[in-house]
Amino acid sequence: AVEVQSLVTNSVLPTPRRAVNGVDPSRIAMLVAVLYRHGGISLLQNDLYISTIAGGQAKEPGCDLAITAAMASAALNKPIAKNVCAIGEISLTGQVRPVPRLEYRLREAQRLGFTKAIVPATQKPLKMEGMTLAPATNLKDALAFLHLAKQRH
């Protein structure tokens, strides 16, 4: 399990700054675009700082949903509950895709105190004793579960 933190600030630079630690910078660029296109949250004019805690690495696609949730949370200034984790790869179309060893990841998250998890809707298990699993088909589903869905006017 890897904790991901994100800070979003208004940029005064012509090209906004992207500072990352423990995360693949090219993956962040892709996730920023997907968050804008499929989540309605634009970070294109913002400085973005993303870091993993305690030297952890979030460089595999199964961390996409957690990273994107952290960015959306920071952009909207709405914290994610401490007992919620997010596991899943995000495609360019905004779909939440299956990840290897989901059951192992969920057991580890549960051991660390998480009681709710957003998981790919197309992947088993969709039940786990002592943990509420929220199946997400796409990024909008995941953001809605986290109360981070962008309000349309």
Where do the language-model regions lie?
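Peripheral, non-AAA+ core regions of ATP-driven protein-machinery
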Residues: 1-153
